[in-house]
Protein backbone atom coordinates (compact mmCIF):
# COMPACT_ATOMS: atom_id res chain seq x y z
CA UNK A 1 0.00 0.00 0.00
CA UNK A 2 1.30 3.45 -0.84
CA UNK A 3 0.60 4.71 2.69
CA UNK A 4 3.53 2.63 3.91
CA UNK A 5 5.74 4.96 1.87
CA UNK A 6 5.50 7.42 4.78
CA UNK A 7 8.13 5.31 6.51
CA UNK A 8 10.67 6.62 3.98
CA UNK A 9 10.35 10.00 5.74
CA UNK A 10 12.25 8.48 8.64
CA UNK A 11 15.45 8.32 6.57
CA UNK A 12 16.09 12.00 7.22
CA UNK A 13 19.76 11.76 6.24
CA UNK A 14 18.90 10.57 2.74
CA UNK A 15 16.40 13.40 2.45
CA UNK A 16 19.00 15.94 3.55
CA UNK A 17 17.09 16.80 6.71
CA UNK A 18 18.20 17.00 10.31
CA UNK A 19 16.85 18.36 13.56
CA UNK A 20 13.14 18.56 14.28
CA UNK A 21 10.91 17.56 11.35
CA UNK A 22 7.19 18.24 10.93
CA UNK A 23 5.32 16.07 8.44
CA UNK A 24 1.87 17.16 7.23
CA UNK A 25 -0.32 15.27 4.78
CA UNK A 26 -1.32 17.29 1.73
CA UNK A 27 -5.01 17.27 2.66
CA UNK A 28 -4.65 19.28 5.86
CA UNK A 29 -5.82 22.84 6.24
CA UNK A 30 -3.66 25.11 8.37
CA UNK A 31 -5.83 27.64 10.21
CA UNK A 32 -3.28 29.58 12.25
CA UNK A 33 0.35 29.66 13.34
CA UNK A 34 1.68 26.18 14.03
CA UNK A 35 4.70 27.12 16.18
CA UNK A 36 3.36 25.13 19.15
CA UNK A 37 3.59 21.93 17.11
CA UNK A 38 7.38 22.23 17.37
CA UNK A 39 7.45 22.76 21.15
CA UNK A 40 8.18 20.20 23.86
CA UNK A 41 10.83 17.60 24.52
CA UNK A 42 9.19 14.48 23.09
CA UNK A 43 11.32 13.06 20.25
CA UNK A 44 8.15 11.95 18.44
CA UNK A 45 4.53 13.14 18.37
CA UNK A 46 1.60 12.20 16.19
CA UNK A 47 -2.14 12.72 16.24
CA UNK A 48 -4.34 10.51 18.36
CA UNK A 49 -7.02 8.79 16.28
CA UNK A 50 -10.33 10.55 16.95
CA UNK A 51 -12.38 7.38 16.49
CA UNK A 52 -9.97 4.93 18.15
CA UNK A 53 -8.48 6.61 21.23
CA UNK A 54 -5.10 5.20 22.16
CA UNK A 55 -4.20 4.65 18.51
CA UNK A 56 -2.16 6.97 16.36
CA UNK A 57 -3.14 8.88 13.24
CA UNK A 58 -0.25 9.67 10.88
CA UNK A 59 -1.61 12.69 8.97
CA UNK A 60 0.62 14.90 11.09
CA UNK A 61 3.84 13.78 12.81
CA UNK A 62 6.73 15.59 14.44
CA UNK A 63 10.00 13.82 15.10
CA UNK A 64 13.66 14.34 15.71
CA UNK A 65 15.60 13.32 12.62
CA UNK A 66 17.65 10.59 14.28
CA UNK A 67 14.85 9.13 16.42
CA UNK A 68 12.63 7.39 13.86
CA UNK A 69 15.22 5.77 11.56
CA UNK A 70 15.29 2.45 13.51
CA UNK A 71 11.59 1.98 12.68
CA UNK A 72 12.32 2.26 8.96
CA UNK A 73 15.24 -0.14 9.36
CA UNK A 74 13.00 -2.65 11.16
CA UNK A 75 10.41 -2.43 8.39
CA UNK A 76 13.02 -2.88 5.66
CA UNK A 77 14.50 -5.92 7.41
CA UNK A 78 11.16 -7.72 7.92
CA UNK A 79 8.44 -6.01 5.89
CA UNK A 80 6.57 -9.25 5.17
CA UNK A 81 5.93 -9.95 8.86
CA UNK A 82 5.13 -6.32 9.62
CA UNK A 83 2.62 -6.09 6.76
CA UNK A 84 0.88 -9.22 8.08
CA UNK A 85 0.88 -7.92 11.67
CA UNK A 86 -0.26 -4.33 11.17
CA UNK A 87 -3.29 -3.23 9.19
CA UNK A 88 -1.88 0.25 8.58
CA UNK A 89 1.44 2.02 8.67
CA UNK A 90 0.09 4.36 11.32
CA UNK A 91 -0.57 1.44 13.68
CA UNK A 92 3.02 0.29 13.22
CA UNK A 93 4.43 3.80 13.64
CA UNK A 94 2.31 4.48 16.73
CA UNK A 95 3.27 1.24 18.44
CA UNK A 96 6.95 1.76 17.81
CA UNK A 97 7.33 5.51 18.32
CA UNK A 98 4.42 6.87 20.33
CA UNK A 99 6.04 6.38 23.74
CA UNK A 100 3.63 6.93 26.65
CA UNK A 101 0.89 8.26 24.36
CA UNK A 102 3.01 11.01 22.82
CA UNK A 103 0.23 12.79 20.95
CA UNK A 104 -0.25 16.38 19.90
CA UNK A 105 -2.58 18.50 22.02
CA UNK A 106 -6.01 17.46 20.67
CA UNK A 107 -7.27 21.04 20.61
CA UNK A 108 -4.60 21.98 18.04
CA UNK A 109 -5.43 19.40 15.38
CA UNK A 110 -9.06 18.53 14.74
CA UNK A 111 -10.90 16.21 12.38
CA UNK A 112 -13.19 17.71 9.75
CA UNK A 113 -15.55 14.73 10.05
CA UNK A 114 -15.69 14.72 13.84
CA UNK A 115 -15.36 18.40 14.78
CA UNK A 116 -16.77 20.35 11.82
CA UNK A 117 -19.41 18.08 10.24
CA UNK A 118 -22.60 17.19 12.04
CA UNK A 119 -22.69 13.52 12.97
CA UNK A 120 -26.47 13.23 13.00
CA UNK A 121 -29.48 14.18 10.84
CA UNK A 122 -28.41 17.87 10.90
CA UNK A 123 -25.78 17.08 8.26
CA UNK A 124 -28.70 17.07 5.75
CA UNK A 125 -30.18 20.40 6.85
CA UNK A 126 -27.49 22.52 8.49
CA UNK A 127 -24.20 23.91 7.34
CA UNK A 128 -21.12 22.48 9.07
CA UNK A 129 -19.86 24.10 12.25
CA UNK A 130 -17.70 27.20 12.07
CA UNK A 131 -13.94 27.04 12.54
CA UNK A 132 -13.20 25.21 15.81
CA UNK A 133 -11.89 27.61 18.46
CA UNK A 134 -8.18 27.19 19.11
CA UNK A 135 -7.65 24.71 16.28
CA UNK A 136 -4.48 25.19 14.26
CA UNK A 137 -4.99 22.40 11.74
CA UNK A 138 -8.03 20.59 10.32
CA UNK A 139 -7.33 17.05 9.14
CA UNK A 140 -9.28 15.66 6.20
CA UNK A 141 -8.79 11.93 6.62
CA UNK A 142 -10.44 10.05 3.78
CA UNK A 143 -13.29 11.84 2.04
CA UNK A 144 -14.24 14.62 1.68
CA UNK A 145 -11.09 16.50 0.74
CA UNK A 146 -10.89 20.26 1.36
CA UNK A 147 -12.09 21.35 -2.13
CA UNK A 148 -15.04 18.95 -1.85
CA UNK A 149 -15.94 20.22 1.63
CA UNK A 150 -15.94 23.80 0.38
CA UNK A 151 -18.52 22.80 -2.27
CA UNK A 152 -20.47 20.46 0.02
CA UNK A 153 -19.70 17.34 -1.99
CA UNK A 154 -18.05 14.04 -1.09
CA UNK A 155 -16.22 13.90 -4.41
CA UNK A 156 -16.93 11.95 -7.55
CA UNK A 157 -15.37 8.71 -6.32
CA UNK A 158 -18.47 7.96 -4.23
CA UNK A 159 -21.65 6.76 -5.95
CA UNK A 160 -24.35 9.45 -6.11
CA UNK A 161 -26.67 7.68 -3.64
CA UNK A 162 -23.90 7.31 -1.07
CA UNK A 163 -22.89 10.98 -1.49
CA UNK A 164 -26.49 11.95 -0.79
CA UNK A 165 -26.82 9.58 2.17
CA UNK A 166 -23.65 10.84 3.82
CA UNK A 167 -24.93 14.41 3.49
CA UNK A 168 -22.67 17.44 3.45
CA UNK A 169 -23.62 21.08 3.15
CA UNK A 170 -21.04 23.53 1.76
CA UNK A 171 -18.40 24.76 4.19
CA UNK A 172 -17.24 27.95 2.45
CA UNK A 173 -15.07 29.30 5.28
CA UNK A 174 -12.48 26.60 4.50
CA UNK A 175 -11.72 28.46 1.24
CA UNK A 176 -10.22 31.25 3.37
CA UNK A 177 -7.42 28.84 4.32
CA UNK A 178 -7.17 26.36 1.43
CA UNK A 179 -5.11 26.99 -1.68
CA UNK A 180 -4.68 24.48 -4.50
Predicted feature descriptions by range:
Residues 2-56, 62-68:
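GT-A fold catalytic core of metal-dependent nucleotide-sugar glycosyltransferases
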Amino acid sequence: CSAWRKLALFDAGKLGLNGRILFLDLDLVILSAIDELFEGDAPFLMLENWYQPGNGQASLMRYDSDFAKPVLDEYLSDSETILKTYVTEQAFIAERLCVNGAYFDPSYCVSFKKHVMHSDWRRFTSKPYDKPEGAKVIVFHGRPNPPDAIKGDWGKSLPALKRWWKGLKPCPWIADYWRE
